[in-house]
């Protein structure tokens, strides 16, 4: 088919469609009193069909009421449309195409960008190859897209889908309702999310990604640190490389992590996992429920533990560590001095390098050790092991049950023994060594004099022991 014959056929089809259109719609413009015209337009190979139409461009068509197809290869169809650029189409009512190869279809749409499309009602496509579909959308930059109602795609290669989304950063995307993006390479999905930094992501409801490559996912999360992630409900991040996952966690230290419910990680590299934990110092850790790690390298694991000293460790329930490098493990233990250790239940290690292991033991002097139940050691370098032993002397020891040693370098082994003398010993049951350098060994013995010994059963050492030679030994002169 020759070009002229094909054009005549297309013209007849347009006239036929135009006649049908007017018969059904009453010319789409209310009461129209002028007679419809079906004729050639003023442009070469152009056609006008309807009332008050103008087809002045080459190969143009103006069909309906008060339409204008001015530029070559353009079409204006409907009512009050203007196709003012080459290869453009304005179809519907009050549409305007100002850029080549653009399309405005619907009502009140405008295209200003080459190759752009505005389809629906009151949409504007200003950018090169931009698209605005729906109602009152604007695609202002090249390769931008706005779909839905009241969306604004203001950055290059941006997309806004949904309702009242605003995207001004290049290569960014917003999906949902009232999301705002003002940075490049960002994503906002959901409702009322905000991204203001490059590479940020806010997904869910009322989230804010305020720093470069930050992520806020869920509801009411806030991420202001670079490369940070706030995921869940009401999490808050204010430092770089930090993470908050769960419900109402706060991570304010660089590279800190808060995971669970209402945890706080405010120290550099601090970690708080669980419920209501606090890791407030650099490299501190709090795991479990209501634990606190408040000094550098401190660790609190379990429930209601407090690690308040440098490199201190509190593990279990209600343990407290206030001495540097100290440890409290179990239930209700306290380690309050340098390198002190309290392990078990309700033990206290308050001396430097002290150790209290078991139940209700107290090691209150430097290098003191208490093992067992209810032992109390107040002497330096002293040790008590067993049940309810009590030591007050330095370098002393008590092993057994309810022994008491109150002087230096003394020892009590057995049950209910008492040693109050210096460098003295009581071994057995209910023995007393009250003099210095004395020994009471056996049952109910008492060594009271200096260097005295009472050995056996209910003996009294009232004088120092002396050497007595055998009677057959002849004394030398």
PLM-predicted stretches and their roles:
Residues 1-33:
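Bacterial Sec-dependent N-terminal signal peptides
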Residues 30-477:
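Periodic small-residue-enriched repeat registers in elongated scaffold domains
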């Amino acid at each position: 088919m020759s070009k002229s014959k094909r054009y005549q056929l297309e013209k007849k089809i347009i006239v036929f469609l135009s006649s049908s259109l007017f018969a059904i719609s009453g010319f789409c413009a209310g009461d129209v009193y002028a007679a419809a015209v079906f004729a050639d337009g003023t442009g070469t190979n152009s056609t006008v069909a309807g009332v008050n139409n103008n087809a002045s461009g080459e190969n143009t068509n103006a069909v309906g009421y008060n339409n204008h197809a001015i530029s070559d290869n353009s079409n204006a169809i409907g009512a009050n449309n203007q196709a003012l650029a080459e290869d453009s189409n304005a179809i519907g009512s009050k549409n305007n195409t100002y850029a080549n190869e653009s399309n405005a279809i619907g009502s009140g749409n405008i295209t200003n960008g080459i190759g752009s499309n505005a389809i629906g009602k009151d949409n504007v496509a200003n950018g090169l190859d931009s698209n605005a579909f729906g109602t009152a959308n604007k695609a202002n930059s090249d390769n931008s897209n706005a779909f839905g109602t009241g969306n604004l795609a203001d950055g290059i290669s941006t997309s806004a889908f949904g309702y009242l989304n605003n995207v001004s950063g290049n290569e960014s995307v917003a999906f949902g309702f009232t999301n705002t993006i003002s940075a490049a390479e960002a994503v906002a999905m959901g409702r009322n999310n905000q991204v203001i930094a490059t590479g940020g992501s806010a997904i869910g409801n009322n989230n804010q990604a305020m720093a470069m490559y930050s992520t806020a996912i869920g509801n009411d999360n806030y991420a202001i640190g670079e490369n940070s992630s706030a995921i869940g409900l009401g999490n808050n991040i204010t430092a770089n490389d930090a993470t908050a996952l769960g419900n109402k966690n706060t991570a304010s230290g660089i590279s800190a992590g808060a995971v669970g419910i209402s945890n706080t990680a405010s120290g550099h590299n601090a970690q708080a996992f669980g419920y209501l934990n606090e890791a407030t110092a650099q490299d501190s850790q709090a795991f479990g429920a209501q634990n606190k790690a408040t000094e550098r390298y401190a660790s609190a694991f379990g429930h209601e533990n407090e690690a308040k000293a440098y490199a201190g460790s509190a593990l279990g329930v209600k343990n407290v560590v206030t001495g540097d490098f100290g440890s409290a493990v179990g239930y209700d233990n306290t380690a309050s001095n340098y390198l002190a250790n309290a392990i078990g239940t309700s033990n206290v290690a308050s001396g430097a390098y002290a150790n209290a292991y078991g139940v209700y033991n107290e090691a209150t002097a430097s290098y003191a050790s208490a093992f067992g139940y209810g032992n109390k050691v107040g002497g330096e370098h002293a040790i008590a092991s067993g049940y309810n032993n009590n030591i007050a002397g330095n370098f002393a020891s008590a092993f057994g049950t309810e022994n008491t040693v109150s002087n230096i370098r003394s020892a009590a082994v057995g049950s209910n023994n008492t040693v109050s003398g210096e460098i003295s010993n009581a071994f057995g049951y209910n023995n007393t060594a009250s003099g210095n350098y004395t020994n009471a060994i056996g049952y109910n013995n008492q060594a009271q004099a200096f260097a005295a010994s009472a050995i056996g059963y209910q003996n009294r050492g009232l004088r120092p022991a002396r050497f007595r030679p055998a009677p057959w030994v002849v004394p030398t002169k």
